[in-house]
Amino acid sequence: MRLRVDVIPGEHLAYPDVVLVVDVIRATTTAAAFLEAGAEALYWTPSLESALAFKDEDVVLAGETGGLKPPRFDLGNSPREALSAQVAGRVVVMSTTNGTKAAHAAARTAKHVLLASLYNAHAAARLARELATEEVAILCAGKEGRAGLDDLYTAGVLAEYLGFLGEVEPEDGARVALAVKRAYPDPLEALSLSAAALALKQVGLEADVPFCAQVAKSAAVPVLRGRVGEALIFKRA
């Protein structure tokens, strides 16, 4: 089975099989936390405007712009906040700067799209392995069009675990991600050095980084199940 890592989304990229979308700080971590809190479904929209179109008393709007909760949204993009949110049985509509856009890029061609992070790394890798017939691709959201150390490190953790689950043929991007993972024995160190973590510190949200650095603490894997309008519908596997 081929193992591929793309460090940022690209319009020219196509995915024939399974894609693990990674935005570890913070969207894919927060997505798993919402499912842990009992959310029925996650609607991932490509823009804040398309998210606001779903605004309703039975819907929770969550997201960020510049790291902060957007106007008229109910919640930000904090996994700590998500885990304690009153979302049981409810739909959570999410829009973020990088993660939701990466998911839309993957969904253009992939058979299966999963949201992965360190938080649900082992569960996400196992499910990807079960679903894949020819390739598992790990798509890093990056930060505003640039590669992110945090996502690349997470891709390395996923790639390593996929290798433990069975024989894989890593492409160059996967080899780079594995090298990054091996260079940082401590997940928190790797994430803390990233531009995404530094940006959170600037807006006083650095406490989210240790949460995002937890490895394999959740079995909740958001899987793409359909669409409504511009939104991708993710539910727990």
UniProtKB/Swiss-Prot annotation:
Catalytic activity reported: (2R)-O-phospho-3-sulfolactate + H2O = (2R)-3-sulfolactate + phosphate
Annotated coiled-coil segments of the chain: none
Molecular-function GO terms, alphabetical: 2-phosphosulfolactate phosphatase activity; magnesium ion binding; sulfopyruvate decarboxylase activity
EC id: 3.1.3.71
Cofactor (UniProt): Mg(2+)
Keyword Hydrolase: yes
Keywords annotated in UniProt: Hydrolase, Magnesium
Family of this protein: Belongs to the ComB family.
PANTHER family: 2-PHOSPHOSULFOLACTATE PHOSPHATASE-RELATED
Name of this protein: Probable 2-phosphosulfolactate phosphatase
Gene transcribed to yield this protein: comB
